[in-house]
Amino acid sequence: MFRAIPFTATVHPYAITAPRLVVKMSAIATKNTRVESLEVKPPAHPTYDLKEVMKLALSEDAGNLGDVTCKATIPLDMESDAHFLAKEDGIIAGIALAEMIFAEVDPSLKVEWYVNDGDKVHKGLKFGKVQGNAYNIVIAERVVLNFMQRMSGIATLTKEMADAAHPAYILETRKTAPGLRLVDKWAVLIGGGKNHRMGLFDMVMIKDNHISAAGGVGKALKSVDQYLEQNKLQIGVEVETRTIEEVREVLDYASQTKTSLTRIMLDNMVVPLSNGDIDVSMLKEAVELINGRFDTEASGNVTLETVHKIGQTGVTYISSGALTHSVKALDISLKIDTELALEVGRRTKRA
């Protein structure tokens, strides 16, 4: 429905002209009651400012002139309803972020949801509604949908992978869109996955380049243990292994020395076969060799088709970069009440 009102509607600067914003990676907390009350909250980060990322998305859309199409076609004093529509089946994610965006553009907009983050929606379902100034609804529309479609796509694939991987846990990686690290990882949590390290700061992850530079697995582990002790740091430590021999080398080091090691990555120990199946015998052997002394993580050749078999090997975690680096957005839309188009036409003498 629509209705004309006296011209008191809030028209946010994004609608007219927006200053150039730079994301400040500060530790300012995002104050939003919706976010704070969620069961699945965004993961913690010491410097990431979610609100500034949201503002940057609005600013890059508005440019220096604002929405010139809205200015030309939508009366500033018009109110309307707009409905969120699922155009395919999937898991919805990004509801809390959408509310933040609408509130930033126009605090008077009223948003109502019929589902929660993490709920499954089916094609054709109207799952939310926005009421208020039509001009501002349309300005916020694309930024809201960009975040929600990406997050929902990540959550949908994560849910499928997490269910198939059981009893192992599914993890994403740091292969996220630049600037959207926290948003992507939040979507993984909403989809039922778990987060790998947030960045370079919250976990030591010894990979092939570190091992080569240090002169071997044992020397790399020793250097890490010394560094953590000297700097009084208590964080998780993971080391990458690619062969059974490297697993034995790690276990040999750990048996002789007190170590901060918490997890062993078993990289590319899943071997694709010509018939489309996978050979997980090396992965099983490594898991049995470790025998619960450390958490284990399978990595490499992880797909929706292979993850169930990998999960049956006894690994603790399975990591997949595809959860965030190859996102298929969930198709959803936000449609203003169709009667609005006629009203706009009448007001502008185009109908």
Curated annotation (Swiss-Prot):
Gene Ontology cellular component annotations, sorted alphabetically? cytoplasm; mitochondrion
Q: State its location(s).
A: Mitochondrion
GO biological process per UniProt:
alkaloid metabolic process; NAD biosynthetic process; nicotine biosynthetic process; quinolinate catabolic process; response to jasmonic acid; response to wounding
State if Zinc-finger is listed as a keyword: no
What induces or represses its expression, per the UniProt entry?
Triggered by wounding and jasmonic acid (MeJA).
- Per the record, the major location class is mitochondrion
Q: Which Enzyme Commission number(s) are on file for it?
A: 2.4.2.19
Whether Plastid counts among this entry's keywords is no
Quote the tissue specificity entry: Expressed in roots and flowers.
Q: Which reaction is catalysed here?
A: nicotinate beta-D-ribonucleotide + CO2 + diphosphate = quinolinate + 5-phospho-alpha-D-ribose 1-diphosphate + 2 H(+)
Instruction: Summarize the protein's role.
Output: Involved in the biosynthesis of pyridine alkaloid natural products, leading mainly to the production of anabasine, anatabine, nicotine and nornicotine, effective deterrents against herbivores with antiparasitic and pesticide properties (neurotoxins); nornicotine serves as the precursor in the synthesis of the carcinogen compound N'-nitrosonornicotine (NNN). Involved in the catabolism of quinolinic acid (QA).
What name does this protein carry? Answer: Quinolinate phosphoribosyltransferase [decarboxylating] 2b, mitochondrial
Q: Which organism is it from?
A: Nicotiana tabacum
**Lineage of the native species?**
Eukaryota, Viridiplantae, Streptophyta, Embryophyta, Tracheophyta
